[in-house]
């Protein structure tokens, strides 16, 4: 019962995150679409790649899709997200708990009638689902003598530097959605992609939107 309650809470967290992300697109302006500097190591290698990928209709895969700002923004967002994942930004990992879930608890099945066909779930051949975290190791205990004072050791939680929290993931994806629309609106000055000078515009526009000048704790935009 406790496991099912944790599962339900986790599902509601993801639903709330998706709603917050979609609402945030309309609330953020270009100057507010700011991402923490510690995520810059994921952003920097990808902006130039995305600018090159979406600057021509042949690389986008659909010429009809790229004839308007919405199609260009979609290309920018999808390409940016794929590039971030390729560079190690785990956007969808959470650190809720190391939860072991049996398939029979999530999808309860009635017993098959005698002589009926059995599935793998009936034979318990399916491995349990799990949200895996890095292994937790306790620090070594100090050697105590007969006159040593009592020492309480508080272990530190494991650190996963490449895993983004749920809040960081929402912040990053909301900023990317906002900036891809801003960049598409800024750079698509001609009737379509083929006649627009996108390659020289996409990269600096994305960088300026994600890291605007004067942002608190921020840094100047990346030069192309």
From Swiss-Prot:
This is Nodulin-C51. Residues 103-124 are annotated as: Disordered. The keyword Glycoprotein does not apply. The keyword Signal applies. It comes from the Eukaryota. Keywords: Nodulation, Signal. One of its GO terms (biological process) is nodulation. The lineage of its organism: Eukaryota, Viridiplantae, Streptophyta, Embryophyta, Tracheophyta. Involved in the infection process during the plant-rhizobium interaction. Residues 1-20 form the signal peptide. Belongs to the nodulin 20 family.
């Amino acid at each position: 019962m406790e496991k099912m309650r944790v599962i339900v809470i986790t599902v509601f967290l993801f639903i709330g995150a998706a709603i917050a992300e979609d609402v945030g697109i309309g609330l953020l302006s270009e100057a507010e679409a700011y991402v923490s500097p510690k995520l810059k190591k994921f952003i920097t290698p990808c902006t130039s790649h995305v600018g090159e990928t979406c600057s021509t209709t042949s690389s986008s895969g659909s010429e009809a899709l790229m004839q308007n700002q919405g199609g260009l923004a979609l290309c920018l967002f999808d390409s940016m997200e794929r590039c971030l994942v390729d560079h190690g930004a785990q956007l969808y990992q959470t650190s809720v708990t190391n939860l072991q879930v049996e398939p029979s608890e999530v999808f309860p099945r009635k017993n098959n009638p005698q002589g009926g066909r059995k599935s793998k779930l009936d034979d318990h051949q399916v491995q349990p689902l799990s949200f895996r975290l890095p292994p937790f190791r306790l620090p070594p205990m100090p050697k105590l003598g007969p006159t040593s004072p009592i020492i309480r050791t508080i272990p530190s939680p494991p650190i996963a530097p490449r895993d983004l929290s749920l809040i960081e993931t929402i912040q990053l994806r909301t900023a990317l959605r906002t900036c891809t629309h801003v960049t598409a609106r800024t750079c698509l000055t001609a009737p379509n992609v083929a006649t627009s000078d996108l390659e020289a515009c996409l990269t600096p526009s994305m960088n300026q939107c994600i890291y605007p000048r004067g942002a608190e704790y921020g840094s100047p935009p990346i030069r192309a």
